Amino acid sequence: MSRESDVEAQQSHGSSACSQPHGSVTQSQGSSSQSQGISSSSTSTMPNSSQSSHSSSGTLSSLETVSTQELYSIPEDQEPEDQEPEEPTPAPWARLWALQDGFANLECVNDNYWFGRDKSCEYCFDEPLLKRTDKYRTYSKKHFRIFREVGPKNSYIAYIEDHSGNGTFVNTELVGKGKRRPLNNNSEIALSLSRNKVFVFFDLTVDDQSVYPKALRDEYIMSKTLGSGACGEVKLAFERKTCKKVAIKIISKRKFAIGSAREADPALNVETEIEILKKLNHPCIIKIKNFFDAEDYYIVLELMEGGELFDKVVGNKRLKEATCKLYFYQMLLAVQYLHENGIIHRDLKPENVLLSSQEEDCLIKITDFGHSKILGETSLMRTLCGTPTYLAPEVLVSVGTAGYNRAVDCWSLGVILFICLSGYPPFSEHRTQVSLKDQITSGKYNFIPEVWAEVSEKALDLVKKLLVVDPKARFTTEEALRHPWLQDEDMKRKFQDLLSEENESTALPQVLAQPSTSRKRPREGEAEGAETTKRPAVCAAVL
């Protein structure tokens, strides 16, 4: 007996506690008293920071500047007590709700589950009631598997992988033997025939798709939360046509208007600014792929799998000089391009430099550019209440924004280079009795000789040329690119190779899954068999 009505009740009633043991398989009875919890809010596994909200697609500081993260060491905790705390019971990350008798509900606690007739499967099709059905013979020994993998910011992405002869379907679309597809919340899973719906998949870590505008849902599948801030959040998403990952920045119009007096400041015209930023095209600048203006703003950005430069520096304590050179060369190219197009970033910091991969040698991209255009004068003054570690001296001593020019970005680049080479910030209120503002405005940075002993004189010289208090005497991006430290042909060749690899990967067409021609077991109904012929696999969601 079909129990799809129970699932509809589950979808409409929201989250409730589940009484079944974690990771258990429970026989489905078609009762509304069964566990019906659906997560109504995102529970990202990303590490939180008390200093800054950020994401792998960039921080939210293009629309609000948050307090800058600090690099100083955290004091060690006191010695733990002798008694070790009990291990917490793992919470399920997903739930499969059975739609037919003979199948059982499943709460997913482990990272991998096989489904099929084989006894080795974690979810074995061995119920006597199921074995008596005609469809049982069409199921494979290992029909499909559901698993999750670590994605951006240590969040997880759920996938379904087809290993059957007669097909596994997600929302009536064939996955294709040997192919995988991201599995999003409320997806319906059918076996052998697209109409033979067996499970509904509930991702307990993400929001329901229905809360997003239809125009957005038509093109993208929304997934995990990657970062959040006072005015919005950043979500991982998948393009429906290609299944490629993207990052979608969501800005709350209501919170943004309240927080920045938007109506009183015409500079806060997000729509106009987005149109300008969409025209920017540089390999070292995050590309805006799409924009949706609904109840909130939705900005679709390319996803950077390597995360933030800040995390890279913290994780490694400091970067190799060769790595610093490769990254900094790209930063200079990006900022030079912005300046040539009349844009001053004014919020350059390691959190706004994203890495294309976890590899040591990789492309970087500047994000949250256009800060100076999106934020008005009043809002910018509020950002100075935070820790201005990367702000140029002229910003701290000026009243309002008058007098700012592109030199402020070059100062920030100098601070970033200092941090990458040494592993600590040049200016910090935690290391001296001198106020942070006085340190910056006097240009007296914290120089530790034993740390810098491993850094070349050329690299240190470039840092000094950028951290000049007088903006007129400070190095420009053009001068920095001509500096002897960056006249490294091997480094430039490596950058070009990485660029070529990226261009090749983005140019390759998406290989769509094709149906299997295997007919080891009978397929029910010849007419139904035609459903799986030459059907391209696409990302899909129940909307």
UniProtKB/Swiss-Prot annotation:
**Recorded consequence of changing residue 347 to A:** Loss of kinase activity and of the ability to phosphorylate CDC25A
Impact of mutating residue 68 to A? Loss of activation and phosphorylation
Q: Which residues form the FHA domain?
A: 113-175
Q: What is the effect of changing residue 387 to A?
A: Loss of phosphorylation in response to ionizing radiation
Residues where Phosphoserine is found: 62, 73, 379, 456
Gene for this protein?
CHEK2
Q: Where is the composition biased (Low complexity)?
A: 23-62
Q: Where is the composition biased (Polar residues)?
A: 8-22, 506-517
Tissues/organs with expression: High expression is found in testis, spleen, colon and peripheral blood leukocytes. Low expression is found in other tissues.
Documented effect of changing residue 17 to S: Found in an osteogenic sarcoma sample; somatic mutation; might influence susceptibility to breast cancer
Entry's Gene3D superfamilies? 2.60.200.20, Phosphorylase Kinase, domain 1 (3.30.200.20), Transferase(Phosphotransferase) domain 1 (1.10.510.10)
Instruction: Supply one GO BP term.
Output: regulation of protein catabolic process
Post-translational modification note? Phosphorylated. Phosphorylated at Ser-73 by PLK3 in response to DNA damage, promoting phosphorylation at Thr-68 by ATM and the G2/M transition checkpoint. Phosphorylation at Thr-68 induces homodimerization. Autophosphorylates at Thr-383 and Thr-387 in the T-loop/activation segment upon dimerization to become fully active and phosphorylate its substrates like for instance CDC25C. DNA damage-induced autophosphorylation at Ser-379 induces CUL1-mediated ubiquitination and regulates the pro-apoptotic function. Phosphorylation at Ser-456 also regulates ubiquitination. Phosphorylated by PLK4.
State what protein this is by name. Serine/threonine-protein kinase Chk2
Q: Which cofactors must be present for this protein to function?
A: Mg(2+)
Example of a GO cellular component annotation carried by this entry: nucleoplasm
Tell me the outcome of changing residue 64 to K.
Answer: In prostate cancer; somatic mutation
